[in-house]
Amino acid sequence: MSRVGKKPVPVPAGVTATVDGQTVKVKGSKGELQFRVPDQVAVTHENGAISVQPRSQTKEARALWGLSRAQVANLVEGVTKGFEKKLEINGVGYRAAVAGKVLKLSLGYSHDIEYEIPAGITITTPRPVEIIVAGIDKQRVGQIAAEIREYRSPEPYKGKGVKYADEFIFRKEGKKK
């Protein structure tokens, strides 16, 4: 039995949620999101909460039960609070700047990398070595942060590169003479 799936997702005041068949639509102060729940799972909206139940007891249905409940909870949290990922840049001369709808990254290559900021996502650089990716869709925020990190992922000897703010880089010792 899914411990995550058992709990109904409370819908706070100021948020409207509608369940139309297998589609859950959530509208809040920050925007509107929708998610299509897999067919193996039934979703209902009652008493100010959205509950998710498996249609059968197959292993796949039970796995999708917890996943679907977590996805619906992320929709509600996204339209109320939003999500953000912080990235840090380590390395001499490595920096980032936002110019309009473009994130400009100087990461030690012969050219600057220009990353087009997608709609629905805000990227800010409070300092030249700090990037904050924010939005209402948790999956997109994480995906964009991962794409930015991928341009120069941290290396294990000096730790140079783009890393998540809470990420620990396992360091290696250099060659010995």
Swiss-Prot record:
Ranges annotated as spanning the membrane: none
Regions annotated as coiled coil: none
One GO BP: cytoplasmic translation
One Pfam family per UniProt: Ribosomal_L6
Gene3D superfamilies named among the record's database cross-references: Ribosomal protein L6, alpha-beta domain (3.90.930.12)
GO cellular component, one term: cytosolic large ribosomal subunit
Disulfide-linked positions: none
Source taxon at top rank: Bacteria
Subunit structure: Part of the 50S ribosomal subunit.
Function of the molecule: This protein binds to the 23S rRNA, and is important in its secondary structure. It is located near the subunit interface in the base of the L7/L12 stalk, and near the tRNA binding site of the peptidyltransferase center.
Family designation: Belongs to the universal ribosomal protein uL6 family.
UniProt name for this protein: Large ribosomal subunit protein uL6
Organism: Methylobacterium nodulans (strain LMG 21967 / CNCM I-2342 / ORS 2060)
Gene from which the chain derives: rplF
